[in-house]
Amino acid sequence: MTSSRLWFSLLLAAAFAGRATALWPWPQNFQTSDQRYVLYPNNFQFQYDVSSAAQPGCSVLDEAFQRYRDLLFGSGSWPRPYLTGKRHTLEKNVLVVSVVTPGCNQLPTLESVENYTLTINDDQCLLLSETVWGALRGLETFSQLVWKSAEGTFFINKTEIEDFPRFPHRGLLLDTSRHYLPLSSILDTLDVMAYNKLNVFHWHLVDDPSFPYESFTFPELMRKGSYNPVTHIYTAQDVKEVIEYARLRGIRVLAEFDTPGHTLSWGPGIPGLLTPCYSGSEPSGTFGPVNPSLNNTYEFMSTFFLEVSSVFPDFYLHLGGDEVDFTCWKSNPEIQDFMRKKGFGEDFKQLESFYIQTLLDIVSSYGKGYVVWQEVFDNKVKIQPDTIIQVWREDIPVNYMKELELVTKAGFRALLSAPWYLNRISYGPDWKDFYIVEPLAFEGTPEQKALVIGGEACMWGEYVDNTNLVPRLWPRAGAVAERLWSNKLTSDLTFAYERLSHFRCELLRRGVQAQPLNVGFCEQEFEQT
């Protein structure tokens, strides 16, 4: 798509300001007009095309049809609108959906195709996609195109959209260790992710404060590592529900079990797993990272990750590897002896590398791929060529753009998170800081830039729990969502502000308590109940 065509579509959208063009994220190709069609809520239908590979019984689309019908019109009945003058009615009051390839019972993957086209004119109202995942994205766009007049009539404008994501991995991280998030909060977050066309839920499940995951192989991990083994855990059924709920919205679940650091919550449940710290020649009574010198450590990891590999069906697991503090390892005489025998000298990065390489081999043997934090790359751990490196540090050891350059120059795929830590808040419209980030603004060849597969907004939990999660996430995470979905040239802040403000109001209408971007109001505030 040429830049002139993009800017023409932006100008056209500005000319028809309002619900008909307040789309978020912005499509790749968009044409519209002021010609509009009436929708009648009482008998509006989503319908499979006769030639569609997906037909009634397709769980992904059957449930999406009901979900979006409720979002558009609610579950009640509507009086037939009183219309004056000539009005066009949407063809048969139906959106026809056609999917080229089957896949209703599958899981989304990194390679899933999410392209779709949406045509609304005098002759047809058609959503065409290669896959059910593209159809989901198109249904979200359709839902945002429908608008209601002050008199209560539903309209949709004549529209032609051709759309696809810029990056295949568009994620959101939730930290459920530092503060436990109820299952309902996670499911609600998945809903809003789908509204924003985000497609990866990065589930950070282990950290020092708590471990809420219920392991059936090592139940003591949860019993002794969670805040409360009854109320603050995720059961096997909870995990299954999250995975299926996400699947029905075209969202992958990327589970993170971070080691060897960030694992103090595992210590009580698995005696001997963590490294005893020493003060001089005596144990201090405190513990550090996982002990990499013991065979028992790797036996535990083999068994635990065999379980995890079966519970979480996505091809990838996130294995962490960040912020390993060597202080405790340095103090421990058994660790020192192990390093001498291995020929590591006093280079604790070699010890870390030994542990992580062994863990990666274990996970690979289960047919899994893996994502790691950037320290694994920075510390020169020997990793497989298909490893995905997540860049999270803004300027240590180098600026994050330089880090992307180095990671991709080495031939690894990369994810960007460094500028998108949503748990960090400031006064004013900080969404703009997230929005203006250009993920490919580093020096590198086209081949290097093709290795950046997307990014993630991160919501770490030190100061975030169920009471403030939603307004801190939304609509700020939407700025990241558009940056990862839309064309690079969709970058005008004024245009973004108008649409994001409207989208925030739409989120409120859908029951999401998204915070305001600035002074103003939402039109639904004036409606009398």
Swiss-Prot record:
Record's catalysed reaction(s): Hydrolysis of terminal non-reducing N-acetyl-D-hexosamine residues in N-acetyl-beta-D-hexosaminides; N-acetyl-beta-D-galactosaminyl-(1->4)-beta-D-3-sulfogalactosyl-(1->4)-beta-D-glucosyl-(1<->1')-ceramide + H2O = a beta-D-3-sulfogalactosyl-(1->4)-beta-D-glucosyl-(1<->1')-ceramide + N-acetyl-beta-D-galactosamine; a ganglioside GM2 (d18:1(4E)) + H2O = a ganglioside GM3 (d18:1(4E)) + N-acetyl-beta-D-galactosamine; a ganglioside GM2 + H2O = a ganglioside GM3 + N-acetyl-beta-D-galactosamine
Annotated region (Critical for hydrolysis GM2 gangliosides), positions in chain: 423-424
Annotated consequence of substituting N157Q: No change of the catalytic activity associated with the alpha-chain. No catalytic activity associated with the alpha-chain
One example GO MF annotation: protein heterodimerization activity
GO BP, one annotated term: sexual reproduction
Main location: other
Cell compartment(s), UniProt: Lysosome
Phenotype when changing P25S: In GM2G1; late infantile
Outcome of swapping V391M: In GM2G1; mild
First and last residue of the signal peptide: 1-22
EC numbers, comma separated: 3.2.1.52
PTM entry text: N-linked glycan at Asn-115 consists of Man(3)-GlcNAc(2). N-linked glycan at Asn-157 consists of either GlcNAc or GlcNAc(2)-Man(7-9). N-linked glycan at Asn-295 consists of either GlcNAc, GlcNAc-Fuc, or GlcNAc(2)-Man(4).
Consequence the record notes for mutating R504C: In GM2G1; infantile
CDD domains: GH20_HexA_HexB-like
Effect of L39R: In GM2G1; infantile
Annotated active site: E323 (proton donor)
Disulfide cross-links: C58-C104, C277-C328, C505-C522
Substitution effect: G250D: In GM2G1; juvenile
Protein family membership: Belongs to the glycosyl hydrolase 20 family.
Disease (UniProt): GM2-gangliosidosis 1: An autosomal recessive lysosomal storage disease marked by the accumulation of GM2 gangliosides in the neuronal cells. It is characterized by GM2 gangliosides accumulation in the absence of HEXA activity, leading to neurodegeneration and, in the infantile form, death in early childhood. It exists in several forms: infantile (most common and most severe), juvenile and adult (late-onset).
PANTHER family, sorted: BETA-HEXOSAMINIDASE (PTHR22600), BETA-HEXOSAMINIDASE SUBUNIT ALPHA (PTHR22600:SF39)
Function recorded in the entry: Hydrolyzes the non-reducing end N-acetyl-D-hexosamine and/or sulfated N-acetyl-D-hexosamine of glycoconjugates, such as the oligosaccharide moieties from proteins and neutral glycolipids, or from certain mucopolysaccharides. The isozyme S is as active as the isozyme A on the anionic bis-sulfated glycans, the chondroitin-6-sulfate trisaccharide (C6S-3), and the dermatan sulfate pentasaccharide, and the sulfated glycosphingolipid SM2. The isozyme B does not hydrolyze each of these substrates, however hydrolyzes efficiently neutral oligosaccharide.
Protein name per the record: Beta-hexosaminidase subunit alpha
